[in-house]
Amino acid sequence: MKTTFLDFEQPIAELEAKIEELRFVQDDSAVDISEEISRLAGKSQQLTKDIYANLTPWQVAQIARHPQRPYTLDYVREIFTDFHELHGDRAFADDLSIVGGLARFNGQACMVIGHQKGRDTKERALRNFGMSKPEGYRKAKRLMELADKFGLPIFTFVDTPGAFPGIDAEERGQSEAIGHNLYVMAGLKVPLIATIIGEGGSGGALAIAVGDVVQMLQFATYAVISPEGCASILWKTAEKAPEAAEALGLTAHRLKALGLIDKIVSEPLGGAHRDAKGMATMLKRSLAESLRQFQGMSVKELQARRHERLMAYGKFKETGAQE
């Protein structure tokens, strides 16, 4: 698949186009231009490093939404084996914006749950662009409770603009469904490892992300509202989204500094979409490291650790002027 370049990546796109042009010419030319191709490839790589070393929060938000970025099912195929998808909330419907099921991780049985956005127009509509309704969160809760019953660790993958804000979702208890999930996750007797792989949008993300370990991919985002939504409220125009992204502090490094996430998983040069298999390999290694720390831990210890972790959010110390 041909790489889609974002606006700020246009200098890279121009170099890559030139490289492709030379490769096409080389196939029909007696002149060896491989040295020039190698030189331009090196220049493109260095330019990518320079651009990605100085990204603004708004540019990170664009990468998190990249249409070719790996989604939950892409990681399921690369990281897990024997995946068996489970459907429905046993109350209303099967929300396809959330996928989940039983699988094996390095041979160990587990439960996998995550948002799924869709690649083309038809699938995006089918998946509701990754915006879940109450039945989606209730499906996730059902799978968490099933994993808890059989002592299976849970892996969740977050990638949503936010919970679906439609009238039908509100009528069926959107806030109750999200709140009930928070309650269930807080009391699980098994470890839950949450990974924000793309967009982490508000309560729609939090509904499957109250984990014993919360990690983010390097160019993922996690915030209470989208930059455009924030800008529309504060400045009455979505054009202020770059300023809003800066104010929201939605990047992995900012959230790690605040203690809101535990780990940052590095992405391949140019983002996860440039090397999906490489990204899956790095993520699998990180998940294995996270799961390992819970081996031999009793349920009481696990729940006490989780409680302490959750109660630490928002803590601060007041320091007055010395007399």
Swiss-Prot record:
Domain of life: Bacteria
Record protein name field: Acetyl-coenzyme A carboxylase carboxyl transferase subunit alpha
Assembly with partners or alone: Acetyl-CoA carboxylase is a heterohexamer composed of biotin carboxyl carrier protein (AccB), biotin carboxylase (AccC) and two subunits each of ACCase subunit alpha (AccA) and ACCase subunit beta (AccD).
The UniProt record lists the keyword Lipid metabolism: yes
SUPFAM superfamilies on file: ClpP/crotonase
Keywords: ATP-binding, Cytoplasm, Fatty acid biosynthesis, Fatty acid metabolism, Lipid biosynthesis, Lipid metabolism, Nucleotide-binding, Transferase
GO (cellular component) term, any one: acetyl-CoA carboxylase complex
EC numbers: 2.1.3.15
Primary localization: cytoplasm
Lipid metabolism in keyword set: yes
Reaction(s) this enzyme catalyzes, per UniProt: N(6)-carboxybiotinyl-L-lysyl-[protein] + acetyl-CoA = N(6)-biotinyl-L-lysyl-[protein] + malonyl-CoA
Pfam families linked to this entry: ACCA (PF03255)
Annotated family: Belongs to the AccA family.
Lineage: Bacteria, Pseudomonadati, Pseudomonadota, Betaproteobacteria, Burkholderiales
Limits of the CoA carboxyltransferase C-terminal domain: 39-293
Pathway in which the depicted protein is active: Lipid metabolism; malonyl-CoA biosynthesis; malonyl-CoA from acetyl-CoA: step 1/1
Single GO molecular function: carboxyl- or carbamoyltransferase activity
Subcellular localization, as worded in the UniProt entry: Cytoplasm
Function comment: Component of the acetyl coenzyme A carboxylase (ACC) complex. First, biotin carboxylase catalyzes the carboxylation of biotin on its carrier protein (BCCP) and then the CO(2) group is transferred by the carboxyltransferase to acetyl-CoA to form malonyl-CoA.
Biological process per Gene Ontology, one example term: malonyl-CoA biosynthetic process
